[in-house]
């Protein structure tokens, strides 16, 4: 007799190794999973939410474009709040500072760290949370869609539900560019199990359904999966920055709410892409169904492209992990929710994490993570009698374990 409906998860088509590099973007749930990944891998291997916690699919798309193509932040992204502190419309409240200069410094440092990890990354995890977005009524060059309202007056914003078509359009414009620049990358989508009671439970379910439909469309989209196309078509060499910039601008033309009128943004994106390749399809927007495999080939031939450290068994680069279903369909009990009855509890996050670990970790990384945990437990031990013979033996054995671990995995546990 069974009293639950377990979500059966087969091993993912790729396997993480101790050499893997991972970027995690998204909601609070992404933060929890990202922190656990950071504890299982060498220091500096995982970058978690370099823009802070983000919820909206198009806000995530903008953050990913910034990380991937390294444009400068628009001037009016940074502003002084009514609390006298400086904030960013593109970041969460984690990027708050007493001065504009300090706020910009924090944002730029986090961006550089994320860019360094993404350049070598073999896995990108994106967690979508809601398609309810907040838009500034005032027109700014950085666009009107904000990542966070930063406790500014509600009269400054308009809340809107992003259409399924617009979310798909943004990502179908961006993902082929991401895959062209980072051909070694795998993308893992998840939907946050957090429930938005403020929208009403019915609307919360509708919002999650739209996010699921967006992800499912992108995973099966020819446009978003430019690396798996096999159709032979004529290509044009877009070696001129203005031509490529025009193509990219046209791709995102319908989404000025996200990027605003950032001509410099698209110029920088074009310049960055041209460093990777001299050949791109003439159809970078919605017409990318016919783009050439040469788009990927040219990027792969770049001298600084990193070979994936994933143990991969598949050709597709987009995948889905059912974190939402594990909580809502398998656990489906309020004892697995936090006291607010909306967020998953720590126990639920641990359960979802354990399932992910067994689905995504290679045997080598499983061993590495287990040894790391055990060694850290030993290092955190506070002896009652540090001069005793038992503690001296324990200390010596721990140091020997650390040395063996470092010899095998190439870093010292801390």
Language model features: what each stretch is:
Residues 6, 20, 337-341, 350-414:
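Conserved catalytic region of serine esterases and O-acyltransferases that act on ester linkages
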Residues 186-188, 212-225, 315-333, 368-371:
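Extracellular serine-dependent O-acyl
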Residues 138-164:
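A solvent-exposed, charged loop/short amphipathic helix patch at secondary-structure junctions
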Residues 32, 43-126, 130-137, 156:
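Conserved SGNH/GDSL esterase-like catalytic core that processes O-acyl groups on lipids
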């Amino acid at each position: 007799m069974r009293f639950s409906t377990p979500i059966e998860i087969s091993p993912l088509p790729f396997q993480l190794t101790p050499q893997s590099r991972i970027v995690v973007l998204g909601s609070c749930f992404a933060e929890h999973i990202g922190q656990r990944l950071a504890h299982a891998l060498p220091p500096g291997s995982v970058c978690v939410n370099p823009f802070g916690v983000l919820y909206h699919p198009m806000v995530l798309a903008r953050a990913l474009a910034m990380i991937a193509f390294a444009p400068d932040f628009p001037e009016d992204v940074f502003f002084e709040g009514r609390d006298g502190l400086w904030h960013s419309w593109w970041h969460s409240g984690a990027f708050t500072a007493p001065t504009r200069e300090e706020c910009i410094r924090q944002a730029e440092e986090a961006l550089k760290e994320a860019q360094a990890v993404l350049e070598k990354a073999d896995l990108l995890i994106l967690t979508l949370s809601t398609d309810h977005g907040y838009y500034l009524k005032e027109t700014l060059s950085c666009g009107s869609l904000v990542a966070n309202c930063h406790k500014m007056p509600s009269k400054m914003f308009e809340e809107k539900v992003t259409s399924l078509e617009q979310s798909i359009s943004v990502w179908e414009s961006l993902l082929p560019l991401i895959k062209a620049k980072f051909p070694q990358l795998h993308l893992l989508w998840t939907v946050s199990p957090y429930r938005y009671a403020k929208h009403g439970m019915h609307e919360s379910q509708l919002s999650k359904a739209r996010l699921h439909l967006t992800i499912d469309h992108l995973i099966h989209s020819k446009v978003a999966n430019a690396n798996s196309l096999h159709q032979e078509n004529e290509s044009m060499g877009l070696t001129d920055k203005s031509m490529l910039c025009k193509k990219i601008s046209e791709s995102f033309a319908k989404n000025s709410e996200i990027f605003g009128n950032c001509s410099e943004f698209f110029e920088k994106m074009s310049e960055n892409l041209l460093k990777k390749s001299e050949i791109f399809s003439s159809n970078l927007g919605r017409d990318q169904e016919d783009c050439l495999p040469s788009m990927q080939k040219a990027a792969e031939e770049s001298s600084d492209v990193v070979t994936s450290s994933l143990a991969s068994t598949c050709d597709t680069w987009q995948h889905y992990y059912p974190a939402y279903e594990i909580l809502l369909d398998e656990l489906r009990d309020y004892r697995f929710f936090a006291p607010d009855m909306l967020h998953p509890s720590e126990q639920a996050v641990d359960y979802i994490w354990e399932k992910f670990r067994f689905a995504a970790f290679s045997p080598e990384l499983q061993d590495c993570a287990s040894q790391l945990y055990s060694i850290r437990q030993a290092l955190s031990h506070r002896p009652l009698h540090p001069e005793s013979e038992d503690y001296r033996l324990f200390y010596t054995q721990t140091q020997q374990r650390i040395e063996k671990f470092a010899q095998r995995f190439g870093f010292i546990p801390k």
